[in-house]
């Protein structure tokens, strides 16, 4: 994959529950703590190294932000780091929370 692909929250939910991809949330710590997808890894500048050690470049990665804009830059960055398949989630956490209100966790 030379460029990231934009996917819907429904597609992301399906990939996540099939084990076909991991989910990262790039929002600020306060927003993440107030609510995030339960399986989301909070990806920040400080946690990037740990994420990359834990997940090889053959891992498909889905990036979630607030509304689906910032995730595009982060998705491109992950591709440049060597990840084979990266997705940006359209609508971000706002769309996830609207579509899957029962699938939201709180806390860091």
Curated annotation (Swiss-Prot):
Its EC number is 2.8.1.1. Transferase that catalyzes the transfer of sulfur from thiosulfate to thiophilic acceptors such as cyanide or dithiols. May function in a CysM-independent thiosulfate assimilation pathway by catalyzing the conversion of thiosulfate to sulfite, which can then be used for L-cysteine biosynthesis. GO terms for cellular component: cytoplasm. SMART domains: RHOD. Belongs to the GlpE family. One of its GO terms (biological process) is glycerol metabolic process. The keyword DNA-binding does not apply. It is found in: Cytoplasm. It is an enzyme of class 2 (transferase). The gene is glpE. Its main location: cytoplasm. It comes from the Bacteria. The active site is at residue 65. Keywords: Cytoplasm, Transferase. It catalyses: thiosulfate + hydrogen cyanide = thiocyanate + sulfite + 2 H(+); thiosulfate + [thioredoxin]-dithiol = [thioredoxin]-disulfide + hydrogen sulfide + sulfite + 2 H(+). This is Thiosulfate sulfurtransferase GlpE. Residues 17-105 form the Rhodanese domain.
